[in-house]
Amino acid sequence: KPMLAYIVAYFSYIDGVHTLISQSTSYGTNLGLDSAGMLLALLLVQVLGLPFCLLYMKLAEKFGARSMVGGGICVYMFICVFAFFMNSLWQFWMLAVLCATSQGGIQALSRSMFGKLLPDKARSGECFGCFDIFGKCSSIMGPALVGVVRAFTANKMLADQGLTAATATAEQVDAINAAAGPFGILSVILIIIVGAVLYFGVLPKVMTNDERKI
């Protein structure tokens, strides 16, 4: 039971993490960031990600991996809200730093938690293979949700102006798509919330006392 609850929670919250990462390029472009700036932003996340990941690991020794993963989930929920209100490049750079603070830590400690919850340690290689597949398949729901919400919002904005995709000019469509983008990003919080409910609400109830100390 703990393993099943954890896998479903992980699938949800890590989907949100991967979606925010994959959508960052289009969001930065909408704010006027060129390809060189985007490359620099991605590099910044990687450079800052390593020391913050090590910090997560160090704090996990004191507070436990479960607590630190929970902290990372909360950080990414805040990132969704912050991204929704973001409208300038300096805020985008702040967003990159925020992502860097938790990206490596939440991924590394999620894997560590999975290893500690394994009921059969002898089959750890096989189980970690399945875990990696879960991680790679987890970026499916998020992009789909972002696309649906963005399209719905854009169509609503067009209708409010008495327009359709067929009657609007290319400039109008581009402007409305850019305006609808933040709503798509905000929708990612729904997936992370599902993971958070399972992680904070369901998982502790099915864990043993020893497992709660992880």
Language-model segment annotations:
Residues 35-36, 120-131, 181:
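Loop-to-transmembrane helix entry/capping segments in MFS-fold secondary transporters
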Residues 183-214:
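Multi-pass alpha-helical transporter architecture, strongest
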Residues 84-96:
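Helix-loop junctions at membrane interfaces in 12-TM secondary transporters
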Residues 51-65, 150:
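Helix-to-loop junctions at the C-terminal end of transmembrane segments
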Residues 19-38:
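Short amphipathic helix-loop junctions that connect adjacent transmembrane helices
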Residues 150-192:
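A membrane-interface helix-boundary motif in multi-pass transporters
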Residues 67-82:
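Structural signature of the two symmetry-related core transmembrane helices
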Residues 105-119:
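Intracellular juxtamembrane helix-capping segments at the cytosolic ends
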